[in-house]
A protein has these predicted regions:
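Short glycine-rich, Thr/Ser-proximal phosphate-binding strand/loop in the N-terminal lobe
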Residues: 4, 8-52, 140-167
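Short glycine-aspartate micro-motif
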Residues: 16-20, 65-67, 122-126, 194
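Glycine-rich phosphate-binding loop plus the immediately following alpha-helix
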Residues: 26, 90-93, 97-112, 121, ...
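Short beta-strand scaffold segments in enzyme catalytic cores
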Residues: 26-30, 72, 114, 131-136
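Residue-level signal for inorganic ion chemistry
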Residues: 28, 68, 195-197, 222
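Glycine-rich phosphate-binding loop and adjoining helix at the ATP-binding site
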Residues: 42-55, 59-67, 72-121, 158-160, ...
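Short secondary-structure boundary segments
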Residues: 70, 127-129, 197-198
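Glycine-rich phosphate-binding loops at beta-strand->alpha-helix junctions
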Residues: 184-216
Length: 242
């Protein structure tokens, strides 16, 4: 099933607004709508400014609840650190009060992983500024921070994130991506591996056993966060009502 086109409404038919917060743009889509909207983010955008822009763009949309994919660590639905590429002030921001609706916050990689999931055990790796990661096993989501694990002389994301791409060039970077995927596959033994993120397009081919993700799956993941009957998500590691 294509969750974006069908809106993943499920049996509960809840109307959801999914917000994908990025370092350069914020993208939004609501259940029942076909065309995502976006606006520029950047280092000067605060959480309050983001909310104001979203309200403006989504003024004519109807929705009951909100999902936010956040570009940083989230624990128990609470943002742990301000994002590197946005203005400070996100950690204690009350999104529920600001929007006037129930809100669930997850790491952006976790939200895209939810939208990419087809069953069994799936590892999602987001090749972006860093290395986003999440694992789903039989419908239970576990956001991860694999990018910070030691690798060679630094960490995984130092080699396969944007810094690695810029430092080593495309050819070496691709080799590191293949090596990292092979190592994580051996360690975690997933049935399915999805490579997403903005830099996945820099790969000439997919590593063995991998499929390419679609950034639009972040919206599908946002819709799925509020589904109750056909998708069981373990929010202990990454989602909670705020």
């Amino acid at each position: 099933m294509d969750c974006v086109s069908s809106n993943c409404s499920g049996a509960n038919a809840m109307q959801v607004l999914a917000i994908d917060v990025g370092g350069t743009h914020v993208k939004i889509l609501a259940s029942g709508e076909k065309t995502p909207q976006k606006f520029v983010s950047g280092p000067k955008m605060t959480a309050k400014q983001m909310v104001a822009q979203v309200k403006k763009l989504a003024a004519k949309w109807e929705f009951d609840a909100i999902s936010i994919g956040y570009p940083g660590p989230v624990l128990q639905g609470r943002i742990l650190h301000d994002p590197h590429n946005l203005a400070p002030g996100w950690v204690r921001f009350d999104f529920k009060k600001a929007f006037g609706r129930p809100v669930k916050v997850v790491n952006d990689a976790a939200m895209q992983a939810l939208g990419s999931y087809k069953g069994g055990s799936m590892l999602f790796l987001g090749l972006g500024t860093g290395l986003g990661s999440a694992m789903i096993v039989d419908g239970f989501l576990e956001p991860m921070e694999l990018g910070h694990l030691p690798y060679r002389k630094a960490t995984y994301e130092d080699y396969v994130g944007l810094r690695g791409l810029e430092r080593y060039g495309k050819n070496k970077w691709r080799k590191y991506v293949f090596d990292v995927v092979e190592r994580l596959t051996a360690a975690l033994e997933p049935d399915d591996i999805v490579l997403g993120g903005g830099n996945v397009k820099q790969l000439e081919k997919m590593p063995k056993g991998c499929r390419q993700g679609d950034n639009a799956n972040a919206f599908a993941g946002g819709f799925r966060l509020w589904m109750k009957e056909d998708f069981h998500t373990n929010f202990a590691g990454g989602a909670h009502r705020r």
